[in-house]
């Protein structure tokens, strides 16, 4: 590979760090904003130079269409997320316990990460202790969907219901009461949508 200019090296580091912290590459606009470019087009020119030198691959037609070459991807497959630190992105690299060779596209929509189920609060719909829950990363939810939510930095899997400014996170087990979240005084973040279950990881 041809050597990088200091600016190209800075952009490559930004791309790698963004993928490690959020699981996604940055958009052109995000690169321009963080590095002080006047426009996303300036970032695009640097990305083209990085691609020409073989440090990244550009996938047309998507704002985050940047990929590291396969040899740069130390780990592949779906990441299994372990304990999530308060205030940290759920896909931050330090939260990844290991990677499983699971095709994300076997789930609809495609899975972005796996979460190990703790407890039996969702047992009535077949989500059991020790299962691996496949999750599609998203930040909004509709009533009735099973979501991974972060409430005051606790991560939980529940069925979502919103009534005005109040959100109810329902268990699928009569032994558990709903979690009530008043958005006027509490924080709630939707981390993703449950899209499938791998039973106890037996076949992995």
From Swiss-Prot:
Functional summary from the UniProt entry: Represses a number of genes involved in the response to DNA damage (SOS response), including recA and lexA. In the presence of single-stranded DNA, RecA interacts with LexA causing an autocatalytic cleavage which disrupts the DNA-binding part of LexA, leading to derepression of the SOS regulon and eventually DNA repair.
Gene name for this UniProt entry: lexA
Pfam families: LexA_DNA_bind, Peptidase_S24
Residues annotated as site: Cleavage: 86-87
DNA-binding annotation, residue ranges on this chain: 28-48
Descriptive protein name: LexA repressor
Superkingdom of origin: Bacteria
UniProt-listed GO biological process terms: DNA repair; DNA replication; negative regulation of DNA-templated transcription; proteolysis; SOS response
DNA-binding as UniProt keyword: yes
Residues of the active site: 121, 158
Transmembrane segments: none
UniProt keyword terms in alphabetical order: Autocatalytic cleavage, DNA damage, DNA repair, DNA replication, DNA-binding, Hydrolase, Repressor, SOS response, Transcription, Transcription regulation
Catalytic activity as recorded in UniProt: Hydrolysis of Ala-|-Gly bond in repressor LexA
Protein species of origin: Shewanella frigidimarina (strain NCIMB 400)
């Amino acid at each position: 590979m041809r050597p990088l200019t200091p600016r190209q090296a800075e952009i490559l580091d930004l791309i790698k760090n963004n993928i490690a912290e959020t699981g996604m590459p940055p958009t052109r606009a995000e690169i321009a904003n963080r590095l002080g470019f006047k426009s996303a087009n300036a970032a695009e020119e640097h990305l083209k130079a990085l691609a020409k030198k073989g440090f990244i691959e550009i996938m047309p037609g998507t704002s985050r269409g940047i990929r590291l070459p396969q040899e740069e991807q130390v780990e592949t497959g779906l990441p299994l997320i372990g304990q999530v630190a308060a205030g940290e992105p759920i896909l931050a690299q330090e939260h990844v316990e290991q990677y499983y060779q699971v095709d994300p596209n076997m789930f609809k929509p495609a899975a972005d990460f796996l979460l190990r189920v703790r407890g039996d609060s969702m047992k009535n719909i077949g989500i059991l202790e020790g299962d691996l829950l496949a999750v599609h990363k998203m930040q909004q939810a509709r009533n009735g969907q099973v979501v991974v939510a972060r409430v005051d930095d606790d991560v939980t899997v529940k069925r979502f219901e919103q009534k005005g400014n109040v959100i109810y996170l329902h268990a699928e087990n009569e032994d558990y009461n709903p979690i009530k979240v008043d958005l006027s005084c509490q924080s709630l973040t939707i981390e993703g949508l449950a899209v499938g279950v791998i039973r106890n990881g037996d076949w992995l």
